[in-house]
Amino acid sequence: MLKRSLTALLISAFACATLNAQEHSRIHQPTLTPQNSGTTNGLIAVWPVNPQVVWASGRAGTFTVTTDGGQTWRAGVVPGAEMLQFRDVQAFSATVAYLMSIGTSGDPTDFRIYKTEDGGITWTIQFENHNPNAFYDGFAFWTPHRGIAHSDSVNGVFPDLRTTDGTTWQDISNMPPALPGEFSFASSGTCVTTQGGRNAWIATGGATIARILATRDGGNTWNAYNTPLASSPSGGAFTVDFRNPFDGIVGGGDLDPANPNSADTAISNDGGQTWTLTNPPPVTGAIFGLSYVGQTGGGGGNNLGRAGVVTANDGGAAWTPDEGNTWFTLPGVSGFWAVAFASPKAGWLVGTDGRILKISF
């Protein structure tokens, strides 16, 4: 959950059992194109609706949106949210989007869900938290009206939320019991992901076991499954994505700077019930965000099949053509929190100082 602030991650690359792009001429690195986000505030989350319409969000109440594939971005600050951080964004068009905020003041009402239906000109607060111990890490939607929001556990219970009308939010009363100390990480808005019309997965850490919480029926019932990712009071599973109902990848690590080589990933081919560690990605620190190249969350193509990208903020970024069997670094890419794709040729990384990179395979 990053507990109000993230520990700075070390900047370095380490040798591991991966392939090198220069050694395999048939592998072509993606094209990376910097774009002007319209803000210098740090960006934390990104959501492409399609190759043209993309939303991103971040610090100081900031959001930014493009309707031309990133040639131009229009940034704004939500009134009344200037002291908040938008740790997640979900959007459905150039006009309809949701933002999820946290704060640093300790006020539980700093967690809010905002919605715009006019492209960010005006925003409505849909939900404001009053649980003094809740800390919400991310949210995800199946449709413009159906979504879930996930919180760290409180007294052994996850006070998660669900909307079925895109307006009101209710408690999910049947979440799996939490392990002692279990929480999630608000690093990129990707500790929660949806797929299809009713599937969702949540990545957790903080306890002795990093787990995946999964639903197949839109949040009516849930199951908890163990992963082999290392977990600790400062580590665990940070980010998860599925390219279909069965095949997914989870990434994590540890925020402890004494453990810089902690990044790990695992894959599942049975909907998250069982997981197998992959070769470690060539990044340092924890993996903040990851995404399949052909698909992000609830939709998109799948042209590159098993290809995916991971980013570890200051620890660099890397991509895999085969779900973690082999890895290639993205040279010079550092300081990015989140990555998401509308299609293989239309992906975006967002990060510190308002930086945006378009990534195209």
Residue locations for each model-derived region?
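Bacterial N-terminal signal peptides that target proteins for export
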Residues: M1-L6
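Bacterial N-terminal signal peptides
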Residues: A8-A15
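Residue-level hotspots at or immediately adjacent to binding/recognition sites across diverse folds
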Residues: Q22-F361
